[in-house]
């Protein structure tokens, strides 16, 4: 195991933590000076900064420019069928159910931690503020994929020749960058799938779309359905097992990559 790249694998997460703290502090200064009134705008502020920082970092480690990136986007669009797009979106919905099922089970195992998590989400205005909705659905999928499946996975792949071990490390770091246990646990599991999608299609774009589908499903599509699930440990455990099994099956159905790895790295 390459200890040098193991250190670099955690460096993006440390930078993310610094940016979150710095963005929150700067936003408080904006509020104090009367420049802004909405305290929830700090979430979008952080994600916009992170998008710039990790976007530049990703292009730096990949050695690609805007021209090559545009070429890759065009190639992805050409080779991505409508069934692939639908499949990724359905996978996102399944992962949304999986994540909520994990929280449902954890509510009975770690009630105080789940209560703290729910209070934190409410204070952040998740699902209620237009700024946080835009940040979590439109901006976060891009920035967090650049951070974890872009920069971090680039370094974890240098630790070991095994993709599965490298994917485990990047998913672990993806869980850690959420900086709370409850969200970190389901982020870890979802991060495993995001890493597999990025590797399968040899592109960050499908992973970004999957991330968008997960977040959009959580906020807009599945709220009513999830509220109808009986609030018992057994019900949530069954939902977890079924959604996990369906997600794995859906992930492995289409074995065709979007394009040959020898053409575009």
List each model region and its residues.
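Alpha-helical transmembrane segments in multi-pass membrane proteins
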Residues: 12-65
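Membrane-interface starts of transmembrane alpha-helices
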Residues: 33-53, 127-132, 136, 158-170, ...
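Juxtamembrane helix-loop-helix connectors linking adjacent transmembrane helices
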Residues: 33-39, 70-143, 154, 158, ...
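Hydrophobic core of alpha-helical transmembrane segments in multi-pass integral membrane proteins
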Residues: 13-20, 48-58, 89-98, 237-257
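Functionally important transmembrane alpha-helices
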Residues: 17-25, 183-239
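Hydrophobic residues within alpha-helical transmembrane segments
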Residues: 11, 169-173, 209, 213
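Membrane-interface capping segments at transmembrane-helix boundaries
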Residues: 60-67, 251-265
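Membrane-interface helix/loop boundary segments of multi-pass membrane proteins
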Residues: 143-169, 196-203
């Amino acid at each position: 195991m390459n200890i040098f790249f193991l250190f670099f694998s955690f460096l993006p997460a440390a930078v993310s933590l610094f940016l979150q703290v710095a963005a929150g502090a700067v936003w408080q200064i904006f509020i104090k000076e009367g420049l802004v009134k909405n305290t929830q705008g700090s979430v979008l502020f952080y994600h916009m900064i992170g998008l710039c920082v990790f976007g530049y970092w990703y292009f730096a480690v990949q050695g690609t420019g805007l021209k090559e990136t545009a070429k890759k986007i065009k190639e992805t669009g050409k080779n991505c069928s409508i069934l692939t797009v639908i499949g990724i979106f359905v996978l996102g919905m399944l992962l949304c159910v999986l994540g909520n099922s994990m929280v449902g089970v954890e509510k009975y195992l770690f009630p105080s931690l789940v209560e703290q998590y729910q209070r934190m989400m409410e204070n952040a205005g998740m699902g209620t503020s237009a700024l946080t909705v835009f940040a979590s659905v439109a901006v976060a999928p891009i920035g967090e994929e650049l951070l974890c499946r872009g920069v971090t996975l680039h370094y974890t792949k240098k630790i070991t020749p095994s993709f599965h071990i490298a994917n485990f490390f990047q998913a672990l770091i993806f869980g850690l960058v959420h900086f709370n246990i409850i969200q970190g646990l389901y982020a870890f599991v979802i991060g495993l799938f995001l890493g597999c999608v990025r590797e399968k299609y040899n592109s960050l774009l499908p992973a970004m779309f999957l991330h968008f589908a997960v977040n959009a499903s959580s906020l807009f599509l599945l709220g009513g359905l999830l509220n109808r699930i009986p609030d018992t440990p057994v019900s949530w455990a069954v939902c977890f097992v079924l959604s996990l099994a369906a997600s794995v099956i859906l992930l492995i159905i289409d074995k065709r990559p979007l394009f040959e790895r020898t053409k575009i790295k």
